[in-house]
């Protein structure tokens, strides 16, 4: 089927040339579907039919004399210039010619040639429709992942690999675990389609390079050791770590005495978003420095890191840009492993503070916190604020990290180190000019610091010497009296629209706030994290900023992260993706369910980092510290039943409880004791620790048999079984399940792709995906779904296994 064109003799538009009625000779033998290509009434059906026959004869000669049925010929009538008409034979026709059964349709060839030809024609038609889908506005990253995973056609896979460049970076980043898992475990055609995009993005972003290197290592660990060494994933990981994907033609950023343009900008007045201009900047800026072979830090690199740099010319080459960050992460992981050997929480906490104090001697450096969503440099870890979290066998810990936000991580100079005793506390940025420090001086504070492209120097900046910033002493008698609220006052004064609030409302809200301020937890040696987690985040930020030598800088930010050693976070990452997808679906369908997915960084098959949920403590900590029921705690924190604060917190509780009940049902989340359910300051509940999902359960006992955890205490907060909020809860459950099943494929494909080549416990058994699909109940009517929700809610409330599991956790781990 080439692109043969037949140009029939021009026709005179006479009255006889109009098509006859159905059933006349040739009137129904040709049915042509056109889309905006002209009128068909100017062509006599008999002439058109004869032209079709001529085309078929030519095609028959081209195919070696094989007779071709006109039924299967993808012919399309095209009006080219509005006057002359032509019939064109297309390889990829947008529509098919349908003809009635007649003598011509009966003339068909026999044998294998006919079957092969029909297969080619069918494939051609399918590819035409597929191309239309790929080029339509409906084609999103979710569809691309589905076709990339399910299609067996190399052409389709290659096309989708190219289409990845058209999607937003954020959209593709969400599916990065799926892309890399397919690259590792699927056939070569899929890998070839994916690799150009991965390489391109690694050249653009150092954070993307780190994510790829970590995930490739983690997902390759399920392979046999002999296969793993020579796998595509291992080779790509070595390529990334060897720094061969570092942006080419980067120019060295020379030290300048002029103020750095990004230092004087307030990061709060701009939104950080990667774009093509950012990528261009990261490619065009930076430098190539000569590595000194005598550097003991380079010579003592671990075996893995040194093996990744074998291809680099030691005499003159760019330093490995990922080396400082990997060293920083390795230091945090080593601390966690050493803490696990200590017997008591108190000893672990003391050791953690000492270890982080030593770590501070290497900061600031060209390192960053991968869980953050903006470019920055780490400058300090307030070591006295770190806490060890509850764990029976391991020692996960929570740290706070001070960073300075920047426009571009690669090209911005590493901030100079400010000693703890070189600065006096200043409580607001706006008072600095009055205290003798002008805006220009602050903007240029770090302008004399060179760009640390030699990352070994950037990581070990102990001997800063002359680069340290000397700030004049500040007299606190005039500066410290300036309130931080002055910024808010100025902002409100700039508003042109008057805001009218009734005096009675002001008095009522003030009295409620004074009467029901959030309570503080008492310090518990067995649970040191409770006090730290209960403190409001904004209060913690203010307190740490006041005591930090970097706190006066306008681009100062405080981040937090949980470091975990000895735990496989790949299942946590899978759960995060499913929660994020469900959150997007419910927002799209306008169902007011509330869930809080938190970021996961997989470092290896047994370590990682987790983004903490701020302003939240576990229900176990709430009950242990307050010695109150959940409802009484709500009344203590938010006021009486009729207050605005209580009603708002109750609504938040219901919306979040319904959302997480659906999550727990769809993913079959287990190990739901009160230590794994958080309660935030606004009344939401947040489930954490998704180590047991789908086919796995604690100790493989399958102890928790209810669809989700719904205790009597939860129902009491909702107002009881007869309350309006409890009915609202069940209505949200139904709406959420209906919305989720409309987009079932988006959820299922996330899990299905990650099952490829995986040895994770959640995929044990051959029916994991089938059971997941069945829980969406695609064949049920909405009335049947409503009955199902009623049954699940009733069964979960009355579940004896939930009560037994809570009792088991109390007896073995002391979890209330």
UniProtKB/Swiss-Prot annotation:
Enzyme class: transferase
Organism superkingdom: Eukaryota
GO molecular function: 1-phosphatidylinositol 4-kinase activity; 14-3-3 protein binding; ATP binding
Residue numbers carrying Phosphothreonine: 263, 438, 517, 519
Annotated EC: 2.7.1.67
Stretches the record annotates as Activation loop: 687-711
Record keywords: Acetylation, ATP-binding, Endoplasmic reticulum, Golgi apparatus, Kinase, Lipid metabolism, Membrane, Mitochondrion, Mitochondrion outer membrane, Nucleotide-binding, Phosphoprotein, Transferase
Modified residues (Phosphoserine): 258, 266, 275, 277, 284, 294, 428, 511
Region listing for Interaction with ACBD3, in residue ranges: 2-68
CC annotations in GO: Golgi membrane; mitochondrial outer membrane; rough endoplasmic reticulum membrane
Domain PIK helical: 52-242
Domain PI3K/PI4K catalytic per the UniProt entry, residue ranges: 535-801
GO biological process: inner ear development; phosphatidylinositol phosphate biosynthetic process; phosphatidylinositol-mediated signaling
Protein name: Phosphatidylinositol 4-kinase beta
UniProt subcellular location: Endomembrane system; Mitochondrion outer membrane; Rough endoplasmic reticulum membrane; Golgi apparatus
Cofactor dependency: Mg(2+); Mn(2+)
Alphabetized InterPro entries for the sequence: Kinase-like_dom_sf, PI3/4_kinase_cat_dom, PI3/4_kinase_cat_sf, PI3/4_kinase_CS, PI3K_accessory_dom, PI4KB-PIK1_PIK, PI_Kinase
Membrane topology, record value: Peripheral membrane protein
Alphabetized Gene3D superfamilies for the sequence: Phosphatidylinositol 3-/4-kinase, catalytic domain (1.10.1070.11), Phosphatidylinositol 3-kinase Catalytic Subunit, Chain A, domain 4 (3.30.1010.10)
PROSITE patterns, A to Z: PI3_4_KINASE_1, PI3_4_KINASE_2, PI3_4_KINASE_3, PIK_HELICAL
Ranges for region Disordered: 1-30, 248-318
Its biological purpose: Phosphorylates phosphatidylinositol (PI) in the first committed step in the production of the second messenger inositol-1,4,5,-trisphosphate (PIP). May regulate Golgi disintegration/reorganization during mitosis, possibly via its phosphorylation. Involved in Golgi-to-plasma membrane trafficking. May play an important role in the inner ear development.
Catalytic activity: a 1,2-diacyl-sn-glycero-3-phospho-(1D-myo-inositol) + ATP = a 1,2-diacyl-sn-glycero-3-phospho-(1D-myo-inositol 4-phosphate) + ADP + H(+)
Region (G-loop): 541-547
Regulation: Inhibited by wortmannin. Increased kinase activity upon interaction with NCS1/FREQ.
Chain ranges passing through the membrane: none
């Amino acid at each position: 089927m080439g692109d043969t064109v037949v140009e029939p003799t021009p026709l005179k538009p006479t009255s006889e040339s109009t098509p006859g009625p159905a059933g006349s000779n040739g009137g129904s033998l040709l049915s042509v579907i056109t889309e905006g290509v002209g009128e068909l009434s100017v062509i006599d059906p008999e002439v058109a039919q004869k032209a079709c026959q001529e085309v078929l004869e030519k095609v028959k000669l081209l195919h070696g004399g094989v007779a071709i049925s006109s039924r299967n010929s993808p012919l399309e009538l095209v009006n080219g210039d509005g006057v002359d008409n032509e019939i064109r034979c297309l390889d990829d026709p947008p529509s098919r010619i349908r003809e009635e059964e007649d003598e011509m349709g009966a003339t068909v060839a026999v044998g294998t040639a006919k079957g092969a030809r029909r297969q080619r024609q069918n494939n051609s038609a399918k590819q035409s429709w597929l191309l239309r889908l790929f080029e339509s506005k409906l084609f999103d990253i979710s569809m691309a992942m589905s076709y990339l995973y399910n299609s067996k056609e190399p052409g389709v896979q290659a096309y989708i690999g190219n289409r990845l460049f058209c999607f937003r970076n954020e959209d593709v980043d969400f599916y990065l675990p799926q892309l890399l898992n397919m690259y590792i475990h699927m056939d070569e055609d899929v890998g070839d389609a994916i690799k150009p995009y991965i390489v391109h993005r690694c050249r653009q972003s150092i954070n993307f390079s780190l994510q790829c290197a970590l995930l490739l290592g983690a997902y390759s660990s399920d392979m046999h050791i002999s296969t793993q060494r020579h796998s595509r994933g291992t080779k790509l990981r070595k390529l990334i770590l060897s720094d061969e994907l570092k942006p080419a033609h980067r120019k060295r950023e020379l030290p300048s005495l002029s103020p750095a343009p990004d230092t004087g900008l307030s990061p709060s007045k701009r939104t950080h978003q990667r774009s093509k201009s950012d990528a261009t900047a990261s490619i065009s800026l930076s430098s190539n420095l000569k590595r000194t072979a005598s550097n003991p830090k380079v010579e003592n690199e671990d075996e893995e890191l040194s093996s990744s740099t074998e291809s680099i010319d030691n005499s003159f080459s760019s330093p490995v840009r990922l080396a400082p960050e990997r060293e920083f992460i390795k230091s945090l992981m080593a601390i966690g492993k050493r803490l696990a050997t200590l017997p008591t929480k108190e000893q672990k906490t003391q050791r953690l503070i000492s270890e982080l104090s030593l770590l501070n001697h290497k900061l600031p450096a060209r390192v960053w916190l991968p869980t953050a969503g903006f470019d920055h440099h780490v400058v300090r870890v307030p070591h006295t604020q770190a806490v060890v979290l509850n764990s029976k066998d391991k020692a996960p810990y929570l740290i706070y990290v001070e960073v300075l936000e920047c426009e571009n991580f690669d090209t911005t100079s590493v901030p100079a180190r400010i000693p703890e005793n070189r600065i006096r506390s200043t409580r607001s940025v706006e008072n600095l000019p009055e205290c003798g420090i002008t805006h220009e001086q602050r903007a240029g504070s770090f302008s004399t610091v060179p760009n640390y492209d030699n990352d070994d120097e950037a990581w070990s900046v102990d001997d800063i010497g002359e680069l340290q910033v000397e700030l004049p002493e500040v007299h606190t008698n005039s500066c410290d009296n300036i309130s931080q609220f002055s910024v808010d006052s100025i902002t409100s004064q700039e508003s042109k629209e008057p805001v009218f609030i009734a005096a009675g409302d002001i008095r009522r809200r003030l009295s409620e706030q004074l009467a029901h301020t959030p309570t503080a937890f008492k310090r518990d040696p067995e649970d040191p994290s409770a006090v730290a987690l209960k403190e409001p985040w904004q209060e913690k930020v203010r307190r740490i900023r006041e005591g930090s030598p970097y706190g006066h800088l306008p681009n100062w930010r405080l981040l937090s992260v949980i470091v975990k050693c000895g735990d496989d976070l790949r299942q946590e990452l899978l759960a995060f993706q499913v929660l994020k997808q469900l959150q997007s679906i419910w927002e799209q369908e306008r169902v007011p369910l509330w869930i809080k997915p938190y970021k996961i960084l997989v470092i290896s098959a047994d370590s990682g980092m987790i983004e903490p949920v701020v302003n939240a403590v576990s229900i176990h900590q709430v009950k242990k510290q307050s010695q109150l029921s959940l409802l009484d705690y709500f009344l203590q924190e938010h006021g009486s039943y009729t207050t605005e604060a209580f009603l708002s917190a109750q609504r938040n509780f219901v919306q979040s409880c319904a959302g997480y009940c659906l999550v727990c049902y769809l993913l079959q989340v287990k190990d739901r004791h009160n230590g794994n359910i958080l309660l935030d300051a606004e009344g939401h509940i947040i489930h954490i620790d998704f180590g047991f999902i789908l086919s796995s359960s604690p100790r493989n006992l399958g102890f928790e048999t209810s669809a989700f955890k719904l205790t009597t205490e939860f129902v009491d907060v909702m107002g009881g079984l007869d309350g309006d909020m409890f009915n609202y809860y069940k209505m949200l459950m139904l709406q959420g399940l209906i919305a989720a099943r409309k987009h079932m494929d988006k959820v299922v494909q996330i899990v299905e792709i990650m099952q490829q080549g995986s040895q994770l416990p959640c995929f044990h058994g051959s029916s994991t995906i089938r059971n997941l699909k069945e829980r969406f109940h695609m064949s049920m009517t909405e009335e049947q779904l409503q009955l199902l929700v009623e049954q699940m809610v009733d069964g979960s409330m009355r579940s004896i296994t939930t009560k037994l599991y809570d009792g088991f956790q109390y007896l073995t781990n002391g979890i209330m």
